[in-house]
Structure formats: structure tokens, C-alpha cells
């Protein structure tokens, strides 16, 4: 006789949510959601939450709490992952030859802040002959925000 499947808990269901999906599911706004950083435990300010939202990373569920990752910790994590899990490095032409598809069709994250690159950012990276790095089965290169030097007033 087949075993009955255990119903998923609320937290297990939300484990696969991006921050945008979680906000819709909970029917709350970004500014009202209290979201701690998984790595440093500080509560993320509105700018950090907006950056996390734009990156389209999944919400972390730990100890019955939803958590994100602040930009400072995401930068540290991206650096550590590059150091430990970098597989190969090449320009977009090499990437396209390896995967058999145009870079615009690939999921590419920023090698510095883990943001999800837009189609135009991927095309810019290809035209500018930027380096693409394979880290944990995911291609990475710098996003527009990380490539652009900060303007000082």
C-alpha cells in the first residue's frame, strides 16, 4: 500500500520563493517586511531589500524565519564562491561555444553582487569582451552597476 505523502508546511512551500513572490503571497510591501540577512543577522534596510528583490535570488528559510542577504554579504559570498568553485574563465564566444546557445538565452549572475543580468547587460558584456566565469554551474560576469565606477560628489 503506498504511503500517504506528507503535506508541505508553509515554510517549505516558501523555500522556493523569490522575494517578489513572497511579498505577493504574504500581501505585504517591501518597506513593511522585516527581512534579516542570513549571514550577518542585521535587518536589511529598504535599499538592501530592493537590491535583493532585483537580484531575483530565492528567500532563505531558516529557523522558521524568512531571510535574505545584504549587499555586503552577497559581495563576500560571490568572492568566496569564485575562489572556491571557479571552473573556467572565458569571453562570451567561448561560453556560447561551450553551451551551444547565445549568452542572451543563459542565466547569468553578477560575479561581484550576484544580481541577475538583463539581456542588455549580457550583450554589453559580450561587446566589451568581458570575462565570463563559470562558478557552480552558473555563468557570471559583472553587472552594469558593478562595472560603473561610483560617482563622487
Curated annotation (Swiss-Prot):
Subcellular location: Host cytoplasm; Host nucleus
ZnF segments: unnamed: 37-73, 110-146
Entry GO CC: host cell cytoplasm; host cell nucleus
Family matches, as InterPro entries: E6 (IPR001334), E6_sf (IPR038575)
Protein name stated in the entry: Protein E6
Main location: host cell
Swiss-Prot/TrEMBL keywords: Activator, DNA-binding, Early protein, Host cytoplasm, Host nucleus, Host-virus interaction, Inhibition of host innate immune response by virus, Metal-binding, Modulation of host cell apoptosis by virus, Transcription, Transcription regulation, Viral immunoevasion, Zinc, Zinc-finger
GO MF annotations, alphabetized: DNA binding; zinc ion binding
Chain's role: Plays a major role in the induction and maintenance of cellular transformation. E6 associates with host UBE3A/E6-AP ubiquitin-protein ligase and modulates its activity. Protects host keratinocytes from apoptosis by mediating the degradation of host BAK1. May also inhibit host immune response.
Record text on subunit structure and interactions: Forms homodimers. Interacts with ubiquitin-protein ligase UBE3A/E6-AP; this interaction stimulates UBE3A ubiquitin activity. Interacts with host BAK1.
Family annotation (HAMAP family): HPV_E6
Organism: Micromys minutus papillomavirus
Amino acid at each position: 500500500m503506498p504511503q500517504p505523502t506528507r503535506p508541505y508546511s508553509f515554510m517549505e512551500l516558501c523555500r522556493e520563493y523569490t522575494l517578489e513572490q513572497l511579498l505577493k503571497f504574504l500581501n505585504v510591501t517591501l518597506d513593511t517586511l522585516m527581512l534579516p540577512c542570513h549571514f550577518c543577522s542585521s535587518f536589511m534596510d529598504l535599499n538592501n531589500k530592493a537590491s535583493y528583490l532585483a537580484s531575483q535570488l530565492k528567500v532563505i528559510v531558516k529557523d522558521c524565519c524568512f531571510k535574505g542577504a545584504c549587499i555586503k554579504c552577497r559581495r563576500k559570498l560571490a568572492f568566496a564562491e569564485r575562489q572556491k568553485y571557479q571552473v573556467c574563465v572565458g569571453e562570451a564566444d567561448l561560453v556560447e561555444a561551450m553551451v551551444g546557445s547565445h549568452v542572451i538565452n543563459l542565466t547569468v549572475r553578477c560575479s561581484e553582487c550576484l544580481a541577475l543580468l538583463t539581456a542588455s547587460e549580457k550583450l554589453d558584456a559580450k561587446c566589451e569582451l568581458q570575462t565570463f566565469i563559470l562558478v557552480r554551474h552558473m555563468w557570471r560576469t559583472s553587472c552594469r552597476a558593478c562595472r560603473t565606477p561610483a560617482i563622487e560628489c
